């Protein structure tokens, strides 16, 4: 984990040195994809199965809070111009020293500082009980065939497959919703872009509430009881598309976020538990990350296609609701839930 935070820091420094932003972000993304299995795998190894839902609830709360805090901090840094002539000085200094003139050097410095502190904190984590069974992280150990077999193995497991299916579907829909909410805030509510971002923050607040409730109300053996939350989320999407009043949009967005948080946390815990039993704690999270990111890419590509075709927002929201409804109904049927 410390090494991956150091790699993220390297990506930021590369951007400062004039490396193309796409390549720099690819380095940061590579580090993030390796960091997540270590983080969630550590949780799986650190707490007993009966506490896994609660641990995931607190982890989800902390992640969303960090996103909100980071977004707010970024806005403050971008809006802070410092003393008179500060921006021009930064641009001149960074051009001479780094070869890339920028007025945002103080923003990059804060990001580097945060990644550096995170790497130092991660370095203090003590090895868990599964340390002896871990494969060293090196390119020679990377095997697509082995990874694909692990992927199929997790999908074929009755409990692991359902939880992986639900989280994959959730993240694909959620990725589109991030952009759809901004567009809806502008077209339906008449808000500017910066105010539309507040609507996104309301969803995040709802996720925090839902994650905390899930950690308090559910245990691993009752994780299947949260599946109908997916149907509630599907019902809310087309309703939001027709809302034109901010006072009504606020509770709807928070309710949608809460439904998503309550659905995601127990499913994550169930997937981690089954994945650790079938594969290993870290490997199962890597499989989960692969499927979820593939879902995000696919859904965003489809969303871009609908925008290119000029499909109205209400129709896009309705299609999202239908995808979620048709996707969740097979696993939400009473007979199916009893079989889990």
Residue ranges and their predicted role:
Residues 125-166:
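Juxtamembrane intracellular "pre-TM" segments in multi-pass secondary transporters
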Residues 1-13, 224-240, 318-321:
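Structural signature of the two symmetry-related core transmembrane helices
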Residues 1, 78, 209-223, 307:
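Helix-to-loop junctions at the C-terminal end of transmembrane segments
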Residues 1-7, 23-79, 170-178, 203, ...:
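Substrate-agnostic recognition of the 12-TM MFS/MFS-like secondary transporter fold
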Residues 41, 45, 101-104, 108-138, ...:
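Helix-loop junctions on the cytosolic side of multi-pass membrane transporters
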Residues 13-17, 69-111, 187-188, 297-317:
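Transmembrane alpha-helix termini and helix-breaking/packing motifs in multi-pass membrane transporters
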Residues 224-264:
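C-terminal transmembrane helical hairpin of 12-TM major facilitator-type secondary transporters
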Residues 85-95, 99-109, 150-209, 243-249, ...:
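A single, central transmembrane helix in multi-pass transporters
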């Amino acid at each position: 984990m410390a090494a991956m935070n150091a790699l993220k820091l390297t990506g930021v420094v590369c951007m400062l040195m004039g490396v193309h932003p796409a390549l720099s972000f690819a380095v940061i993304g590579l580090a993030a994809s390796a960091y997540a299995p270590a983080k969630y795998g550590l949780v799986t190894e650190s707490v007993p199965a009966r506490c896994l839902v609660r641990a995931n609830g607190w982890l989800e709360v902390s992640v969303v809070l960090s996103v909100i805090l980071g977004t707010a901090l970024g806005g403050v840094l971008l809006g802070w111009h410092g003393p008179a002539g500060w921006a021009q000085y930064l641009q001149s200094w960074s051009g001479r020293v780094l070869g890339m003139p920028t007025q945002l050097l103080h923003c990059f410095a804060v990001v580097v500082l945060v990644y550096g502190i995170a790497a130092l904190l991660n370095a203090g984590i003590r090895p868990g009980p599964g340390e002896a069974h871990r494969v060293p992280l090196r390119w020679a150990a990377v095997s697509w065939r082995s990874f694909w077999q692990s992927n199929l193995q997790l999908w074929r497991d009755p409990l692991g497959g359902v939880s992986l299916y639900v989280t994959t579907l959730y993240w694909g829909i959620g990725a589109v919703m991030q952009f759809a909410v901004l567009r809806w805030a502008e077209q339906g509510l008449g808000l500017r872009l910066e105010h539309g971002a507040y609507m996104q923050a309301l969803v995040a607040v709802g996720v925090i509430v839902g994650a905390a409730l899930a950690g308090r109300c559910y245990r691993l053996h009752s994780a299947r009881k949260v599946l109908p939350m997916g149907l509630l989320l599907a019902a809310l999407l087309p309703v939001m598309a027709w809302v034109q009043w901010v006072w009504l949009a606020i509770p709807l967005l928070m309710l949608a976020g809460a439904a998503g948080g309550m659905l995601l946390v127990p499913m994550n815990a169930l997937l981690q538990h089954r994945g650790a039993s079938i594969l290993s704690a870290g490997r199962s999270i890597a499989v989960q990350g692969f499927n979820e990111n593939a879902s995000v890419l696919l859904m965003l590509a489809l969303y871009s296609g609908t925008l290119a075709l000029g499909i109205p927002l209400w129709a896009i929201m309705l299609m999202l609701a239908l995808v979620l409804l048709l996707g969740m109904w097979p696993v939400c049927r009473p007979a199916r839930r009893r079989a889990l």
